[in-house]
C-alpha cells in the first residue's frame, strides 16, 4: 500500500515527538513510524522486587543484552561510546537518568574560546526560547540563579541533594569550585497530570509513577490529540530517494 503524507517522522523519541507536536497545529497529514510499542506503566521494573535484575535483562541499557523483539544488534566494539537506547514510544527518553542541563552559552563558541571543532551557526540567545519551551513541556525541576547561565526559571523547584550530593557540594566548596544542582526532568510537584516523585525506584529504567518525563507522557498525548498519527511496531528498512538524491519516502 502506498501512503502519501505531508510529513513523515521516523522514531518517536525526543526529537521525533517534539517535531510532531510543533507541527501538529498546521493540520498537515503527519505520520510518525516507531519500531517499538507503547510501554505500560505496569511494565517498568520498579514495580517489582526484581528491578535490579531486570536492569541486566529486558530493561538493560544495551540492546544487545536487552534483546527485545523490537531491538536490533549493535556492534560497538570499536567505538569509545557504548550505546544506550530504547526502542518504544518515547525512545531513549524512556531510559535515561532525567539529567537535563542546558548547553552553556560558551558551548556554542568552542572554536572561538578553545580553538577546537567549530562554533555553532546559532548562539544560546537564539535557542533560549526553545530551551524554555522544552523545559515547560518536559517539566524541568531546578534551582534558579546559576551564574554559569543567563537568568532562567525552571518550572519546578529542585530535587533535594541527598547525602551524597551534599558531600560532593561540601568538597567542592572546600576546593573553591563552582557547583550548582543540575536541572532534571523529575517532577517535584504535581505537574501537568504527573505526580511528584516519591522515590519509587531508580530513574533510568523508566518511571512507573510518571514523575520522570518521557515524551510518551509529555509531547505525544498533545500531538496525537492534535491529529498526528503515530504508528507503532513499524520498522523502517529503507529510505527511498528521488532522481535528485533527495529523500522521498520509506519502505517499512
What is the role of each PLM region?
Residues 40-42, 189, 240:
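Generic structural signal for helix capping and beta-alpha/helix-loop junctions
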Residues 56, 71-73, 99-102, 111-236:
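Conserved redox-cofactor binding core of oxidoreductases
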Residues 3-4, 25-27, 82-83, 88-90, ...:
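Short, well-ordered loop/turn elements at secondary-structure boundaries
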Residues 17, 36, 90-91, 139, ...:
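Glycine-centered flexibility motif
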Residues 238-252:
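Conserved beta-strand-loop-beta-strand element in the redox core of flavoprotein oxidoreductases
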Residues 45-49, 194-198, 245-248:
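Short low-complexity, flexible loop/linker segments enriched in glycine and/or proline
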Residues 1-112, 116, 121-125, 129, ...:
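N-terminal glycine-rich phosphate/pyrophosphate-binding loop and immediately adjacent elements
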Amino acid at each position: 500500500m502506498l501512503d502519501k503524507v505531508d510529513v513523515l517522522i521516523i522514531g518517536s523519541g525526543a526529537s521525533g515527538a517534539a517535531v510532531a507536536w510543533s507541527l501538529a497545529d498546521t493540520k498537515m497529514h503527519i505520520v510518525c513510524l516507531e519500531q517499538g510499542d507503547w510501554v505500560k506503566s505496569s511494565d517498568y521494573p520498579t514495580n517489582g522486587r526484581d528491578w535490579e535484575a531486570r536492569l541486566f535483562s529486558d530493561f538493560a541499557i544495551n540492546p544487545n543484552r536487552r534483546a527485545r523483539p523490537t531491538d536490533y544488534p549493535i556492534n560497538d566494539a570499536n567505538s569509545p561510546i557504548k550505546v544506550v537506547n530504547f526502542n518504544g514510544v518515547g525512545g531513549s527518553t524512556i531510559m535515561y537518568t532525567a539529567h537535563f542541563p542546558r548547553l552553556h552559552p560558551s558551548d556554542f563558541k568552542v572554536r572561538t574560546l578553545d580553538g577546537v571543532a567549530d562554533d555553532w551557526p546559532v548562539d544560546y540567545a537564539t535557542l533560549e526560547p526553545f530551551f524554555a519551551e522544552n523545559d515547560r513541556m518536559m517539566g524541568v525541576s531546578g534551582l534558579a540563579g546559576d551564574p554559569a547561565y543567563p537568568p532562567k526559571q525552571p518550572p519546578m523547584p529542585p530535587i533535594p541533594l541527598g547525602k551524597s550530593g551534599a558531600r560532593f557540594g561540601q568538597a567542592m566548596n572546600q576546593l573553591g569550585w563552582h557547583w550548582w544542582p543540575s536541572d532534571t526532568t523529575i517532577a517535584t510537584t504535581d505537574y501537568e497530570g504527573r505526580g511528584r516523585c516519591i522515590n519509587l525506584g531508580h530513574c533510568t529504567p523508566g518511571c512507573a509513577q510518571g514523575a520522570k518525563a518521557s515524551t510518551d507522557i509529555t509531547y505525544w498525548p498533545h500531538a496525537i490529540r492534535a491529529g498526528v498519527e503515530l504508528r507503532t511496531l513499524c520498522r523502517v528498512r529503507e529510505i527511498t530517494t528521488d532522481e535528485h538524491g533527495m529523500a522521498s519516502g520509506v519502505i517499512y
